[in-house]
Amino acid sequence: MNQLTNFMNPVAKPETFDMIKIGIASPERIRSWSFGEIKKPETINYRTFKPERDGLFCARIFGPIKDYECLCGKYKRMKYKGIVCEKCGVEVTVTKVRRERMGHIELAAPVAHIWFLKSLPSRIGLLLDMQLKQLERVLYFEAYIVLEPGLTPLEKFQLLTEDELLDAQDEYGEDAFSAGIGAEAIRTLLENLDLEQERTDLMEELATTKSELKPKKIIKRLKVVESFIESGNRPEWMILEVVPVIPPELRPLVPLDGGRFATSDLNDLYRRVINRNNRLKRLMELRAPDIIVRNEKRMLQEAVDALFDNGRRGRTITGANKRPLKSLSDMLKGKQGRFRQNLLGKRVDYSGRSVIVTGPELKLHQCGLPKKMALELFKPFIYARLDAKGLSMTLKQAKKWVEKERKEVWDILDEVIREHPVLLNRAPTLHRLGIQAFEPVLIEGKAIQLHPLVCAAFNADFDGDQMAVHVPLSLEAQLEARVLMMSTNNILSPANGKPIIVPSQDMVLGLYYLSLEREGEPGEGMLLADMAEVHQALHIGAVTLHSKIISRVPQTDEKGNEYLKRFETTPGRMLIGECLPKSHTVPFDVVNRLLTKKEIGDVIDQVYRHTGQKETVLFADAIMALGFRHAFKAGISFGKDDMIIPASKEQLVDETRSLVKDFEQQYQDGLITQQEKYNKAIDAWSQCGDKVANAMMDEIRATPKLPDGRLAPINSIYMMAHSGARGSQAQMKQLAGMRGLMAKPSGEIIETPIISNFKEGLTVLEYFNSTHGARKGLADTALKTANSGYLTRRLVDVSQDCVVIEEDCGTTRGMEMRAIIQGGSTIASLGERILGRTTLEDVVDKDGNVIAPVGTLLDEATTQRIEEAEVQSVKIRSPLVCEATLGVCGKCYGRDLARGTPVNIGEAVGVIAAQSIGEPGTQLTMRTFHIGGAAQVNEQSNVEAISDGTIEYRDMATIVDQRGRRLALSRSGEIAIIDSEGRERASHKLPYGAQIMHKDGEKVKKGDRIAEWDPFTMPLITEKQGVVKYQDLIDGKTLTEQVDEATGIAQRVVIEYRAAGRSKKEDLQPRITLLDDASGEAARYLLAVGTMISVEDGQTVQAGDVLARVSREASKTRDITGGLPRVAELFEARIPKDNSVIAKISGRIEFVKDYKAKRKIAIVPEEGDPIEYLIPKSKVLEVQEGDMVKRGDALISGSPNPHDILDVMGVEALAEYLVAEIQEVYRLQGVKINDKHIEVIVRQMLQKVEITDGGDTTLLPGEQLDYLEMMEYNAKLPKNGKPAEGRPVLLGITKASLQTRSFVSAASFQETTRVLTEASVQGKVDSLQGLKENVIVGRLIPAGTGAAMNRVRVTASSKDAALRAAMRVANQEHLIAPRTAAEEHAAELAQGPEAAIGDDPLGKVQGEDFTTDDVMVEERPEGASEE
């Protein structure tokens, strides 16, 4: 019987294998799978509905149609099991075998497998060293190929047309050489390949080749040849002689009503193949003319191509309704393919969905489940319980009772549901908090009730959202749901470690209102003894919630004893104080202030850190109830009159109008350019808008005193916005201020602002202007969702196999963290960045005392101490430099953000990182900003001191000009501020030509301006004095007078000059030369295109004068990619559009020579060889001849190319750059993400190395492979062998996911056919280490609880082996112990099939009846269950 469908062991359980290998099937292998040859294209008999014999659904080949019944009906029932009916030839067995048994088609002529032919690079082409075009001509019978030239002058592999072939045969004789056509010819060539010989030839060629491009091609071929040798695949197997036919149940034929049939497309494709094959056989028997046979063979080839991959070559074969037929490849590919539809995303039973409504009276761990829904979901449990209680005799009766909904059923439902958590999920599930467990509470109605505090995690609102309910069935699942997924366990967000259970909207408003303190309220200044008195006073109206009172509040000391302490507070704040947990770590002070949404979040954070999870949950529930109650009691509402339009608006608008008129006039008079006018106008209007907004806020914020001495009630709109409940200052500005400037869809700003606000109403023109940008916004939102989802998918795919696998990898590398400071304000403090990380070195304060020893996990208290000691930088461990193989270690990762504890082994940190970065993706913008207008305002143009200290110049050459200003002349210089203890507080890079306010060593105060510069132009400053001489500056060729058409003012500008014709003399280099007194050349300055010259020819200049200006506008008007596209660009490691050029070494700049459109410059180091760069002339150089540059400095401005950073500066610098750039995009949107998530992803992008030196291994220079694989190769070397070396390569996330070591995971991501083709040629083995592969083969993932199970499995199998050895010694007399693996296998086979089941140590453990190891020994037959 066939090995695939051994009835005792039908399909290998996913637990029993550890690896999956993919290869190319040989014809023998295909025949051994098959249960018979399919000879006819018929499917079933349409009259009797019985399958045709030898057809595509033949019962004799594939198995019976009904269980244990042969086709003709001679044998029925179980007792004939295994008998083959002599009449119809059908074996009596279960129908299920029709899902497993395969057939085959013997082809009359060999056919090439389209995957190996057309999947680029073509494997057949690489092996034979032929082009795909030529191969196709041979395979599709258009040309002959010379197989053996014999003694003729023809060459092997030469293509001949039919006429050429006949001529050659006439000339040399028919037997002098042999030529072939079609797949047969290719097969002969592949059979005759000597792979070993080919390998040695290629190696020699590689060693001797001189050209640049050759090695790449040779390496490609060498790889294919080697993979064939190593995998044991034969090249001729890429040509098929036998086509396998998949089991009929997998390509079903279903009768529809009305006598029609619905069938799988595969049946059509198979029928085509069989028809053409049979016709070809007949033609060959009839000895038909060659041309007819050849045509039939070509058609057969095309039919098989269509079966395997329809549409890959030639016309797509379509069905009756012009729809392309789905081939085998299409079954796997894409979102609807096998991988993504059925293996990675399955539908589950025991689930339901319904609309959600709010459930404010629920506890945090509860959800309201409609009774009807619960009854349906928990049916099996109810049947079991009815049965156990003896209420129903049979299952049928139990069903009836449940359907009739008798009252006993409801009681039992209550019992069943108690303590049985359910999972709630809201699509789209963007992060792991999108599925959480709750305890169901039965409710009437048909809607699910959801606790208001978890809405933020689900991103749910109650405007008609739906949610799905799932029931965890097994005990383990219930346990995990309760211990790990319960909503009470998910208080902190895994993205940033801040609480995600934070009150919002009404609750915030209520708490804000409670914590308001107001002057002149009744009962102000009362002294109240304690909480009871406060309640009483409130009840009788002696005080209001906002009266200032003095009262005693119960506090807890460190020993846990209560005592009373006096506070100046308000009754409202005391009500909030009542909810606080009783602990000395959260004193009443935390709520004795005005609470906005942010502050409430901080309080919850503090409560969680100091008192733990249980107290936090109780506190959250309490303040939620309090918030709702008081939002309701406050009765806050607003009307039109609450939007107060400031009185000063008119005047401000008029002032700005006249200002803009002035700009218009200046433009007409030619004092400013069009662009400058636009910028100034937009500046003026945006400032006006801000002034109006500020005036409005002042008026709305104000609470004037009423005649009776009380304050006027606070403005409701202001309360809502200020508390963070709803609305923002920007929205208030539009309601009652001035709508402001609008953008066009292109992102440019329209020059005329909208002066009205919504209260006044817009004019028609204003309304039209505002719709322009609004529509763009709506269209963007739709695109954004899809883009963001795709980014998340790629991120998950690249990082899914990154799991914490050990405690400590023991690395000595790390990253240096310091505070991020931009434009004088701290964006991220040092404490924020190192919180929850592990130190790499001792952290010491200025006196040398250790604050945190090496290996400390920094918690809040320690980081606070570090910040107080004013430590400037801390070295920490990072997942980037973690040396753990196949994952990261706990120390490098640090704290698990969602729990606030050190990370557990088995935590899937990769997926968490991907979700944390992808989830806020929908909040990012899609725009690429065109700079222009208001965006220019934020261009930085000065540096201020962030603290007191002393100025220190570093590599900073300066010059003092005639006006006594000190100008920076160095391009890589820095200016640092050193504090009194000698520590560096800040260092700033200054642009060339910046004016520096202080001398080296001068003292500065905090907030002093250190330097400033013009952000829009870059000057060219002379360092010597002399006389200006123009060179190659010829009017009309390289120099032009540009006159602004509107103003008539002329400026001399250098233009690009292309020499006409081929005259070499005309190669002009526009430059200014300075002549000193002796008329010698003192200095020369090359001028880039677009430079405006500020001096005359022959003018005398002093040191420090400006010779010319380059407009930085030119280098700055490029689009800034913002938002989501920018994040994607960084993660894909794309080379940016205007990429800068980085100096690879430090040295002096020299200009070598000019070419037509490029210029060659060199960096000459102090020792070693110079490095040359070719730079387009259109680019503005940041350096001049003779400048000193440092390694990593930019030669041309622009966005740096991440690959360059990696090559020049190393892994840490690259990571720092990527983290900073990605964080900046998110920070602009106000999204907080912890750095370590980005580091995890960058780690996955840096897994590969490019071999620089193969050493004594078989690796070739230029090959790319995993760092681990390179180490494996090196480990195999003999003792004194020279190891291979490589340099890290940065791969984009898509590329990195496609190049994972697991082919199953890569195939399920993208380009399925290509991945599988490559894997099968190499005979790849997937060791199933990542998460995705395990999901696909259907076992527990090796993360979380699955990691523990994995460990158990390993120990169990080793124990098994030990037991077996012991048994073998005991049974020595029964069984002579086999010594080799082969003998052992033979002994196993001799025992019959029963022994070979139960390979899996956990397979024995089923349900309740656990058996211990020693009991198992007794039951097992000798030597059974070999692993």
From Swiss-Prot:
Coiled coil: none annotated. Mg(2+) binds at residues 461, 463, 465. Disulfide bonds: none annotated. SUPFAM superfamilies: beta and beta-prime subunits of DNA dependent RNA-polymerase (SSF64484). Signal peptide: none annotated. This is DNA-directed RNA polymerase subunit beta'. Residues 1394-1427 are annotated as: Disordered. GO terms for molecular function: DNA binding; DNA-directed RNA polymerase activity; magnesium ion binding; zinc ion binding. The RNAP catalytic core consists of 2 alpha, 1 beta, 1 beta' and 1 omega subunit. When a sigma factor is associated with the core the holoenzyme is formed, which can initiate transcription. Its EC number is 2.7.7.6. The keyword DNA damage does not apply. Binds 1 Mg(2+) ion per subunit. Binds 2 Zn(2+) ions per subunit. Its cofactor is Mg(2+); Zn(2+).
